[in-house]
Amino acid sequence: FENAIGYAAINAHHNRFDITGSEKNGLDMVEDHGERTVVVGQFPGLAKRLPNAAIIERDPLPGCYPEEAAETLLPNAKQVIITASAISNGSIAPLLDLSKNAFVIIVGPSAPLSAKLFDFNVNAVSGYIAMNTDALIHTVMEGGAVSAMRPHGRFLTLMR
């Protein structure tokens, strides 16, 4: 619970209305380099966008790798896309250590848009900025997915 409160406070501070950066989703910056592209966490539409990427997942679906594969896949990766959930669940540090030879992007609505992440081998961070908070709260209370949140804010990407 304390981690969740801390993470929410970090995002409230960094993901502000006035922040500037590239107005695109971080996944739009990624090219398919086959298995040299490693994705940590499953994203909607990922198979279509990066059909040859190696996907590491906590509960792997068919075609995905288990978490233990990170030690083998990440050091050899050309680019690594990490779900922002890895920050809140505490798994981000070892993933970044293993990815030091790759271009690393942290992606997801909960990604804190902080340049401080660049000090930890992150090259880009792509998150979400809430613009219409009342509508967003209503969407979340109804169990809306990220696609339902999209009209109430904007994605933004910071680059190193």
Located regions from the model:
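Short, conserved loop/helix-junction motifs that constitute active-site signature segments
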Residues: 50, 73-75, 96-101
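Conserved acidic residues
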Residues: 35, 78, 123
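Electropositive, gly/pro-rich neighborhoods at or near active sites that engage anionic ligands
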Residues: 1-44, 140-142, 157-160
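Short glycine-/acidic-enriched loop or helix-start segments at secondary-structure transitions
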Residues: 26-27, 48-49, 91-93, 116-117, ...
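Rossmann-like adenosine-cofactor binding region
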Residues: 89-95, 104
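Conserved mixed alpha/beta catalytic, RNA-binding, or beta-rich assembly cores of soluble enzyme
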Residues: 5-7, 11-15, 36-73, 83, ...
